[in-house]
Structure formats: structure tokens, C-alpha cells
């Protein structure tokens, strides 16, 4: 099969449907087919457009497939999705999308399906979604927001008026969020440097020290990135790390640190002094932290492979601790569209809640009296956020909720158990944080 961007996208989509881990699968397929430049960008655009709109694409295709999509061979299913995505969302002419899809059936040795692909796409590409009649609000949300049933039901229950927008809202204005390294520059100066290099739509974000920019390629391709002038990190994530209020000379723990963005911000706040222990449970993810720290030139960071649910004698008592715990990820559904189709299994959710609670208890033991603990997630699930903090305070009366010095952006929902960012209200990722003080 000759290498081409459409074939690469379809091959990656077949693997993604089987195995998940969308970004890793796409990267591997692009390397395997040796795509570069525009071809690489086009393949990536097809892949992520299908993931982002899969619910809508599938609904439309099902109107013209009496036996349904599930009965088709996986390559044929993904060829249909990819072609419809191009015609509907990527401004590719219908004739080109259809003709190239028919060619792909031969490339994937599915020539017997070429007639079906041609006939279905010529009708599907002109389908008017405004004429659709949905069975109920859940189906409407699954189709218009491109979500699985479990996620659609969660959003309909908890955020009924914002559900579709939460699924599709582009956090940080659809731009890449950066953190200026204050040891080398500041946000205003970084904006000027990026603009001088031809980067478009550069502006400061709402979180102090953040910068938003639109890059033609990867932000990691910039010389300023390689020189440690900035790292890539969402504004909501930056806000959580700022609430730790790390100071020079302190001992600070980042318990669930990979891939390392918050560690870098904490090291910056500490002015590369004191000791920052940056930990993660997987060694390959710890290596990501090491790579980022080395690029930025920090010498006050010690990396450690560590299970944060257990007390590790290698970790000292700390002045400040950040616990950015594993979570359901329901706050970043637009950024990671494959999460929209996850099963919200009650048993797995109970395990996740227990893991979060165990990490909080570990942090409580490691924190010095008078110290600051910040708990954060990238979910908008109340059980993992406000209710988790309420339960922690019941177990640990030596803690109280603290008010961070950093001002929260407009739209944050602040309660007695922490602060919540909902994308449609703040313009940032869905995120939760709570600053806690150990009083004795």
C-alpha cells in the first residue's frame, strides 16, 4: 500500500478503535509511513477530526447503512468516517473525498466494498443534520456533541444547559497555552519574541505568566522552546501549580507529576533553589519529567518513580505538596475527544475515588504542620472534586481550606470545598483545585 496521508489516517483510526491511546497511535503511523510537512498535517487533521466528530459522523452514516456501521470491516468503517469528515468539516470537495475513499478500499484490500462506499458517501455528504429527529435528549447530545452514552448521561445530569458546549468548547481560545519561564523572560517579552518569529495570534492569557499562541507546526519546534524560554501547559493547570505558592529554598513535593508541566512551574517559582521532588508511578513517565527539567536547565529537581498511594521513606517532610491526582478526565473532553466515548463503570469509578483518597492521605502524612497542600483534577465530576475534599476534611480535622493569593479568573465557581473551572464559563480547561492548610 503506497504511503499517503488518507491511508495513514485510516490505518491509525483502525488501531485507535481497537487499542485507544490516540496520540501514540497516530505518531507511530506517521513515522511508519514517513509522512512529513503538509501530508503529515493533513493525516493528523483527518484523524483528529474523525475522533472529534465521530458521534455525528456515525449517526449520518447509519442513515444509509441498513445493517449498521458495526457490521462493516474496520478499514471500511474508518474509510467512510474519514471521507465524511473531510467533506463535512475540512472543506474537501465531496467528489474528491468520495473518489479518494473508493481508492482506499483497494489500498486496504477491500475492493468488494467500493460500490457501497461510493453510494453511501454520495448521500451522506449531503445529509442535512437539521432534519434529524432524535429519540430523546441523550441521543441528541450523543450525536451533536459526539459522545458515548455514559458521558452524555453524565453531562445531561450534571450540566444540562451546557452539555453540548462542554463537549465542543475550545479551551484557551483554541490556541496553545504556554508558560513563560520567569528565570529567562516574562509573558509580555515572550509575546514579543514569538511575534517577531512569525507566530500568529500571540497574546497573554488570563492566568498570570501564561501566553496563548497559534503555531503553524509544533510549539516544540521553536528555538525558544529548546532554550527553555517556555513550556506548554494549559492555563487551568498553571493555576493549580500557582496555588501551591512555592517559595525559594523550600522542600516541595509534586506527587503525580508527569509529564512535568506543573513541576517546571514550581521550579520556576522556587527560583531554582530548595528541593523539588517530582514523582510519578511509571518510570517511562518519570523520564518525560527528566527530559523537560533538563531542557529548562533546573538543578533543584529530583525525579523519583513512586506510588503516591503509599508512604515512601525516600520522601521527606515537605513545606508544600501538589497532588494532581489521576481522574476521569471529564474536564478536557474537547481537547481529548477519545475520552468522550469512555465507559463510566461504577466499579472503576469507586477504585479511582479510593486511589485519589489514598494519595490525599499520603500527602497529609508528608506535609509539615503549617504547610500547604493543593489537590487538583482535570475533571468536572463532583465525586472526584468537592465531595472528595469534604471526605478528606472529615478524616483529617488538622486541615482547613485555604484561600490562595493568586486571583481566580472570571467564571470560576468557588465553594467551601474548592474552585471549579467549567470550560464554557472560564474559557479554560475543565479543572478543579483546592488549597488546604495543615494547622497542626
Positions of PLM-derived features:
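S-adenosylmethionine
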Residues: 1-440
Amino acid at each position: 500500500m503506497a504511503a499517503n496521508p488518507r491511508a495513514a489516517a485510516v490505518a491509525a483510526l483502525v488501531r485507535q478503535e481497537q487499542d485507544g491511546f490516540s496520540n501514540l497511535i497516530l505518531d507511530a503511523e506517521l513515522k511508519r509511513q514517513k509522512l512529513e510537512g503538509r501530508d503529515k498535517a493533513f493525516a493528523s487533521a483527518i484523524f483528529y477530526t474523525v475522533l472529534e466528530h465521530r458521534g455525528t459522523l456515525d449517526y449520518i452514516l447509519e442513515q444509509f447503512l441498513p445493517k449498521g456501521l458495526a457490521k462493516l470491516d474496520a478499514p471500511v468503517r474508518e474509510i467512510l468516517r474519514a471521507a465524511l469528515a473531510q467533506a463535512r468539516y475540512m472543506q474537501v470537495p465531496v467528489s474528491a473525498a468520495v473518489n479518494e475513499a473508493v481508492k482506499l478500499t483497494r489500498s486496504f484490500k477491500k475492493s468488494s466494498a467500493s460500490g457501497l462506499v461510493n453510494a453511501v458517501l454520495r448521500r451522506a455528504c449531503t445529509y442535512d443534520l437539521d432534519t434529524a429527529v432524535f429519540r430523546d435528549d441523550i441521543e441528541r447530545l450523543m450525536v451533536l456533541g459526539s459522545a458515548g452514552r455514559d458521558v452524555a448521561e453524565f453531562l445531561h445530569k450534571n450540566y444540562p444547559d451546557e452539555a453540548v458546549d462542554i463537549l465542543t468548547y475550545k479551551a484557551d481560545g483554541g490556541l496553545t497555552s504556554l508558560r513563560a519561564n520567569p528565570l529567562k523572560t516574562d509573558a509580555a517579552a515572550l509575546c514579543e519574541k514569538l511575534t517577531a518569529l512569525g507566530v500568529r495570534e500571540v497574546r497573554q492569557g488570563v492566568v498570570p505568566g501564561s501566553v496563548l499562541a497559534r503555531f503553524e507546526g509544533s510549539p516544540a519546534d521553536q528555538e525558544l522552546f529548546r532554550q527553555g524560554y517556555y513550556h506548554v501547559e494549559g492555563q487551568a493547570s498553571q493555576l493549580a501549580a500557582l496555588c501551591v505558592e512555592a517559595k525559594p529554598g523550600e522542600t516541595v513535593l509534586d506527587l503525580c507529576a508527569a509529564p512535568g508541566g506543573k513541576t517546571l512551574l514550581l521550579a520556576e517559582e522556587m527560583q531554582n533553589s530548595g528541593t523539588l521532588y517530582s514523582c510519578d508511578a511509571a518510570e517511562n513517565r518519570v523520564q518525560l519529567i527528566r527530559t523537560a527539567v533538563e531542557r529548562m536547565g533546573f538543578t533543584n529537581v529530583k525525579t523519583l518513580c513512586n506510588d503516591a498511594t503509599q508512604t515512601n521513606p525516600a520522601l521527606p517532610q515537605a513545606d508544600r505538596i501538589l497532588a494532581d491526582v489521576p481522574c476521569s478526565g471529564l474536564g478536557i473532553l474537547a481537547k481529548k475527544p477519545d475520552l468522550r466515548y469512555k465507559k463510566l463503570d461504577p466499579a472503576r469509578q469507586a477504585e479511582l475515588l479510593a486511589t485519589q483518597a489514598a494519595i490525599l492521605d499520603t500527602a497529609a502524612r508528608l506535609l509539615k504542620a503549617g504547610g500547604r497542600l493543593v489537590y487538583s483534577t482535570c475533571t468536572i465530576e463532583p465525586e472526584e472534586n468537592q465531595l472528595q475534599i469534604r471526605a478528606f476534611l472529615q478524616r483529617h480535622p488538622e486541615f482547613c481550606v485555604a484561600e490562595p493569593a493568586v486571583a481566580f479568573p472570571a467564571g470560576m465557581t468557588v465553594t467551601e470545598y474548592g474552585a471549579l473551572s467549567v470550560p464554557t464559563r472560564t474559557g479554560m480547561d475543565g479543572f478543579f483545585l483546592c488549597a488546604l492548610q495543615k494547622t497542626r
